[in-house]
Amino acid sequence: MTTLFSKIKEVTELAAVSGHEAPVRAYLREKLTPHVDEVVTDGLGGIFGIKHSEAADAPRVLVASHMDEVGFMVSEIKPDGTFRVVEIGGWNPMVVSSQRFKLLTRDGHEIPVISGSVPPHLTRGKGGPTMPAIADIVFDGGFADKAEAESFGIRPGDTIVPDSSAILTANEKNIISKAWDNRYGVLMVSELAEALSGQKLGNELYLGSNVQEEVGLRGAHTSTTKFDPEVFLAVDCSPAGDVYGGQGKIGDGTLIRFYDPGHLLLPGMKDFLLTTAEEAGIKYQYYCGKGGTDAGAAHLKNGGVPSTTIGVCARYIHSHQTLYAMDDFLAAQAFLQALVKKLDRSTVDLIKNY
């Protein structure tokens, strides 16, 4: 587990919000290149390794995570040197105030900033504390005025990411970090590429990571258009509801995600997932999603693409501190390897036998 923790720490501490995924793209290029036949990018910056098949009728299979994490973007530098921001991806305003962040300038400098909050002293006589709107939360780097902030290279459009380090829980079973959504998926495809290195598959495999998922599943549109897969496997992290009495319990294995508002699991795909999990002894749990994944975009492309999401759940996602189980990652990785190895022409035709 020590090695796995080190890998997770490395990938989760990369800073890359939607549209600014270069650090993760560089990471994946390095990890994928030794294990695939070629590495390509799409027009928005998604990156994918290709493993060619010797089978004449090999189906095209796309396995894609997403590189981006949630964060913010500077919308205005105020005269007093503080910043207004717009959110990149979904945030609960309750977790934004009084946190440390990194502001990334155009020339690559990291500027420490914090998100402001109103102390209780200043709310007395005004009806007490209220829920802030993110547009009203001030981000503060300690600058005297706008000119000083600009002298450090800060401009509107610069990105802001949580400043948070990965740590182990006391029982050494779980990890607390930022960005498990979706550096989970990034590490999954990296580990998959290494596991399949040198192996011959019954499919033409495209494996890598999309961009801009957190702002509308945008990268999934470009990659599925580019590669025209017959099957699409998203690899993504979902919110755990276990401490609130809901679905998704950390430590209970990978997810069979049968529903979310943007995607329904087709019967043929569901049978394939369950049969494979049971044959391989994979620990899994059923999951009804309330958000979406890249499968929601991919399955509607190119006349329709049978899709699913190979996922795990984590507590408190889209915040500085997400908590998740390493065993769930291992279960999901074993599941993904088993699925990819079985996706030959006959299996894909069976999934699509309407």
Place the predicted regions along the sequence by residue.
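N-terminal hydrophobic/helix-forming segments and targeting peptides
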Residues: M1-Y354
